[in-house]
A protein has these predicted regions:
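Glycine-rich phosphate/diphosphate-binding loop of Rossmann-like nucleotide-binding domains
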Residues: 54-72, 165-255, 260-261
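A short, gly/pro- and small-residue-rich
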Residues: 125-146, 264-290, 315-316
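Phosphate-coordination loops involved in phosphoryl transfer and adenosine-cofactor binding
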Residues: 43-49, 172-174, 292
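Positively charged, low-complexity intrinsically disordered leader regions
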Residues: 1-62, 66
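Phosphate/diphosphate ligand-binding glycine-rich loop within oxidoreductases
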Residues: 38, 42-50, 56-165, 303
Length: 345
């Protein structure tokens, strides 16, 4: 079967078919193996990819710039504060400026595609970032790639499973533990949602652990449940920090995320609350109860809070491998959606 994704937006892996996910992963692995060869280095020749950052980053900006360069193109950094864009607050205009409709259509004339990064600190309500990204995609006739919004992070999800497959092969039937952890960063849901969605799509058993009061949005939990049901796999939830670490778990993902009331109480109150729950940490004692599990994390890691140094820097940590894979999965996305590469699976 040949997979053609030319012109497709990539907003969330749940909106891709499993065949499209597998095609992207196949190409990313091929690109990683032939990184410095000539096979792919002219795919974006003389083309510009725009990177629109409402929020800062380390891995995302550098990996997208490197991806465009290695495909023969150029990535241009944009910030909203340098552009005269219209701003609204809960539907009320607070700053006059250009509408998304107008800005998006103009940007599409200049570029082969655009990535957008807009997290919770740039919006007032959960889902607003994703809605803004989709509004740009609506008005642009070139591919829009989600570089992380307040709901989803498809590039991270693809990179997670690529690293997991590299170390343990086919993921079907294997078990992952996604566990909340305390910390000082008040993190959004995007990477957590994406990992839960893509691992359940690819046939994994999923365990989810979090303290009471840190439930994930029900709409995303419903999708994970449906994915597991469709694959005949298990989905379990616990509110015990120890219960998820069992002898069938082959991957552990410990990460902080904020509570459902974050937008009401604010970042400082959220950090004060979360920092008290010190039992919620991934340590070696807990990892020893698993099936020699690998430790994964999207980074940046809040060491000593989300995970101990012993685990994060230990032999079973694949966090740096996954971070590298951001480059390769993003090259694959750009190659298929922008350059129009077709992949046989």
């Amino acid at each position: 079967m040949q997979i053609d994704m030319k012109g497709k937006d990539v907003v969330c892996t749940q909106e891709l078919s499993v065949d499209e996910i597998n095609a992207l992963l196949k190409l990313a692995k091929e690109m990683k193996a032939a990184r410095y060869g000539d096979k792919y280095n002219q795919l974006l020749k003389d083309q510009t990819f725009l990177m629109f950052f409402f929020n800062p980053s380390l891995r995302t900006r550098i990996s997208f710039e490197a991806a465009a360069t290695e495909l023969g193109g150029h990535a241009q950094f944009l910030e909203p504060k340098t552009m005269r864009l219209k701003k609204t607050s809960n539907g009320v205009e607070v700053q006059a400026g250009e509408t998304i409709e107008d800005a998006a259509q103009v940007l599409a004339r200049y570029a082969c595609g655009m990535g957008i990064r807009i997290l919770e600190t740039s919006v007032e309500n959960y889902g607003d970032g994703n809605a803004i990204l989709r509004e740009y995609a609506k008005w642009m006739d070139v591919p829009v790639i989600n570089m992380a919004d307040d709901k989803y992070h498809p590039c991270q999800g693809l990179s997670d499973v690529m690293g997991m497959q590299e170390h343990k092969g086919d993921l079907k039937g294997k078990t992952i533990l996604m566990t909340w952890a305390h910390g000082d960063l008040a993190r959004s849901y995007c990477s957590v949602h994406e990992n839960l969605l893509i691992t359940s799509r690819l046939g994994m058993n999923v365990k989810l652990a979090f303290p009471k009061g840190y439930d994930l949005p029900e709409e995303e939990i419903a999708k994970v449940k449906a994915n597991c049901e469709a694959n005949g796999t298990k989905f379990e939830i616990t509110n015990d920090p120890d219960a998820g670490y069992t002898d069938d778990v082959e991957f552990v993902y410990s990460r902080n995320w904020f509570g459902p009331d974050f937008y009401e109480i604010g970042k400082e109150a959220e950090i004060a609350r979360a920092s008290k729950m010190t039992d919620w940490i991934c340590n070696q004692e807990r990892m020893d109860r698993t099936k020699d599990a690998l430790y994964i994390h999207p980074m940046p890691v809040d060491r000593g809070k989300e995970v101990t140094d012993e685990v994060a820097s230990g032999p079973n940590s694949i966090i740096t491998d996954i971070a590298e894979n951001r480059l390769h999965t993003q090259k694959a996305i750009m190659a298929m959606t922008i350059a129009g590469m077709k992949i046989d699976i």
